[in-house]
């Protein structure tokens, strides 16, 4: 059945206007004739309804999202299959995707970026608490309401940590531009993988571009594994730069320990409370040193001017009085650079190539994947 305006699904959901077309389906605005409310209906494309794998994945999206009850996640109301079509009835979220905002505005302020990170991480924390990993966190899946609230959408490729994945062994679901290194090397995605993807979003919002680019999905996936992110602009306050680089660690153990901690750290930096951010994410201390800010527990501090975007931190002439509140800024020191993350993940080129080829759920043949893997290995071993 091809969706058109006026069609009623399940005897109840009358389609009115098409909102968007995605890779797997269409999203329509609809009126619930029973409850009288306006909803969003996601309808699986006809070419996929006959594919058992796609149908299972679509059902899984309904089941996964229905597990969650959080203001930062778009609610699922119903699911049905009718006349060869499968549909998912969801909360209609007003606003626009972050991808559209970034396309128009290019760069967001540190405060606005931190707010998006904090709210998204809080929603992901609710998903992770249910054992649910999103696996495709990207700007297009973050709806921003007119009041600035974030709603995480599209759990279509999410995976419960204790269930067998629907994808084939060695195949990756996700978008290469936001793919965590462990996903790009064929390892199982975890909650930390979602935080890495959110770090890419934060970088893009602050810099106006993504940290890794390439001529193909394979090249971008390899960059996620092997390359160090370019420094963020100096106009971004050092503690904010440090948080983003912490999220973009190649080693998941160097990222924030969980989404709730990340949300707390981002909120702390919004309050200009660097010490509070380090208490939430202890791993952040090493990245602060890398940005020229050291000793989060030290007594000597100078205020951080977020409004003026001052990123140099002259040492305060005196120390804080006993009992005074912790400030957001920290003294300057000459930091020793940490070991380059690019050294990590070597030897994973073949897996990264296979993952990039399989992005968006593509089902490349074994012969094609072998050819791609060989090409990437040849590229890495070629002199010069």
Where are these regions (language model features)?
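Eukaryotic protein kinase
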Residues: 1-306, 311
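C-terminal or otherwise distal, non-catalytic regulatory regions appended to signaling enzyme catalytic cores
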Residues: 296-384
């Amino acid at each position: 059945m091809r969706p058109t305006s006026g069609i009623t699904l399940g005897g109840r959901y009358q389609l009115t206007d098409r909102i968007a077309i995605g890779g797997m389906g269409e999203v329509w605005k609809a009126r619930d004739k029973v409850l009288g409310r306006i909803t969003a209906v996601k309808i699986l494309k006809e070419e996929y309804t006959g594919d058992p794998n796609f149908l299972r994945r679509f059902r899984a999206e309904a089941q996964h999202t229905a597990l969650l009850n959080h203001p930062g996640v778009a609610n699922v109301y119903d699911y049905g299959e009718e006349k060869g079509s499968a549909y998912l009835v969801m909360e209609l979220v007003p606003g626009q995707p972050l991808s559209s905002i970034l396309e128009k505005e290019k760069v967001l302020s540190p405060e606005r970026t931190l707010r998006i990170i904090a709210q998204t991480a809080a929603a992901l924390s609710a998903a992770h608490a249910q054992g649910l990993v999103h696996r495709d966190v990207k700007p297009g899946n973050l709806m921003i309401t007119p009041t600035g609230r974030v709603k995480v959408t599209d759990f279509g490729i999410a995976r419960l940590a204790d269930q067998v994945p629907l994808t084939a062994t060695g195949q990756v679901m996700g978008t290469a531009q936001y793919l965590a290194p462990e996903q790009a090397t064929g390892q199982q995605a975890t909650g930390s993988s979602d935080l890495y993807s959110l770090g890419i979003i934060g970088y893009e919002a602050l810099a106006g571009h993504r940290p890794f680019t390439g001529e193909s999905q394979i090249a971008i996936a390899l960059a996620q594994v092997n390359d160090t992110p370019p420094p963020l602009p100096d106009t971004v306050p050092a503690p904010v730069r440090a948080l983003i680089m912490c999220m973009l660690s190649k080693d998941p153990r160097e990222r924030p320990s969980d989404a709730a901690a990340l949300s707390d750290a981002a909120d702390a930096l919004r309050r200009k409370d660097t010490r509070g951010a380090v208490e939430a994410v202890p791993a952040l201390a090493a990245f602060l040193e890398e940005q020229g800010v050291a000793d989060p527990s030290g007594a000597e501090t100078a205020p951080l001017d977020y409004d003026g975007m001052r990123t140099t931190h002259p040492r305060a002439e005196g120390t804080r009085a006993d009992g005074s509140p912790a400030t957001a800024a920290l003294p300057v020191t000459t930091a020793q650079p940490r070991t380059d993350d690019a050294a990590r993940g070597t030897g994973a080129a073949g897996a990264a190539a296979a993952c990039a080829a399989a992005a968006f759920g593509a089902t490349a043949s074994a012969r094609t994947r072998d050819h791609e893997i060989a090409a990437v290995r040849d590229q890495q071993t070629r002199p010069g």
